[in-house]
Swiss-Prot record:
Belongs to the Cdh family. The lineage of its organism: Bacteria, Bacillati, Actinomycetota, Actinomycetes, Mycobacteriales. The gene is cdh. It is an enzyme of class 3 (hydrolase). This is CDP-diacylglycerol pyrophosphatase. Pathway: Phospholipid metabolism; CDP-diacylglycerol degradation; phosphatidate from CDP-diacylglycerol: step 1/1.
Length: 260
C-alpha cells in the first residue's frame, strides 16, 4: 500500500477508536475468566466474519470489534478478560502461522499492521508504555485455541523487556540463537529495521528458516519487539508436536511493567 494511503487508513483508525478508549482510561474492571469446556476453534472467525465484518457492511458499526478496515482487510478486537490486550485479525480466512497465504509475495503485511495498532494498548495505559515494552506474538497451532490468525498486541513481561535491552542488533543480521532463554524457552532472533519491517514479508523469512531447519510451520511461534531506535527483533521458537512453545508467554497482559 502507498504510504499516503497507509497514513489515511491509520488516521481513520485513530479517530474511530478515540471514543471507545476514552472510557477505558478511567478504570478497567475485568471479569474473572469462566471455567468453560474446550473452546470452539472457529469462535474468533465467527465473531470477525459473521458479526464485525457483516455488521459493518450493514450498519457502519464495528461492534463487537474495535475497528474494521476493509482497505487493509483487517479487524482489531479487544481480547476478552484482559484489560489491555488487543488482537489483529485478518478478514480473510487464514488459519494461523502455518497458512501458505501468509508467505505469498503479495501477501498482506499483517505484522506491521499489528505494530501500527500498538497505540490501542498504550492509550489504555495513559501513554505511559514505551514502544520498547510492546510485543507482538503469534502462537503455534498446538498452543492456541483458535484457528483464525490473530496477532497478540500487548505489553512485554518485565523479564522479557530486561533480556531484550541487552540485545545488540548488529549480531542478528542473520538468524542467531539468543544466549539466554525467554520465558523459559530458546528463541532465535533476526534483526530488521523499520523500513524492512514495513515493506518485507517477514512470514517468508520465517518459513525459509523453519523449513531449512527441517521443522514444521504449524509448530513455529514468533514475536516481534522494538529493541532499539529504528530496530526490531523478530523472534522464532521452533516447537514440536509434543513440546509446543507459545510466544505469548513473553507478554504480560496485566502490563505490570508499567506499575513497577
Amino acid at each position: 500500500m502507498p504510504k499516503s494511503r497507509r497514513a489515511v487508513s491509520l488516521s481513520v483508525l485513530i479517530g474511530a477508536v478515540i471514543a471507545a478508549l476514552a472510557g477505558a482510561l478511567i478504570a478497567v474492571t475485568v471479569p474473572a475468566r469462566p471455567n468453560r469446556p474446550e473452546a470452539d476453534r472457529e469462535a474468533l472467525w465467527k465473531i470477525v466474519h459473521d458479526r464485525c465484518e457483516f455488521g459493518y457492511r450493514r450498519t457502519g458499526a464495528y461492534a463487537p470489534c474495535t475497528f474494521v478496515d476493509e482497505q487493509s482487510g483487517t479487524a482489531l478486537y479487544k481480547a476478552d478478560f484482559d484489560p489491555y490486550q488487543f488482537l489483529l485479525i485478518p478478514l480473510a480466512r487464514i488459519t494461523g502461522i502455518e497458512d501458505p497465504a501468509l508467505r505469498e509475495s503479495a501477501g498482506r503485511n499483517y505484522l506491521y499492521d499489528a505494530w501500527a495498532a500498538r497505540f490501542l494498548v498504550t492509550a489504555r495505559l495513559n501513554n505511559s508504555l514505551p514502544e520498547s515494552d510492546v510485543v507482538l506474538t503469534i502462537n503455534p497451532k498446538n498452543a492456541r485455541t483458535q484457528d483464525q490468525l490473530h496477532i497478540h498486541i500487548s505489553c512485554s513481561s518485565p523479564t522479557t523487556s530486561a533480556a531484550l535491552r541487552n540485545v545488540d542488533t548488529s549480531e542478528y543480521v542473520g538468524w542467531k540463537q539468543l544466549p539466554i532463554d525467554l520465558g523459559g524457552r530458546r528463541f532465535q532472533g533476526l534483526a530488521v529495521d523499520t523500513k524492512a519491517f514495513e515493506s518485507r514479508n517477514l512470514f517468508r523469512d520465517i518459513y525459509l528458516k523453519v523449513t531449512a531447519d527441517g521443522k514444521k510451520m504449524e509448530n513455529a511461534s514468533i514475536a516481534v519487539a522494538n529493541v532499539a531506535q529504528d530496530q526490531f527483533l523478530l523472534l522464532l521458537a521452533e516447537g514440536t508436536e509434543d513440546q509446543p512453545v507459545a510466544a505469548e508467554t513473553l507478554q504480560d497482559h496485566d502490563c505490570s511493567i508499567t506499575k513497577s
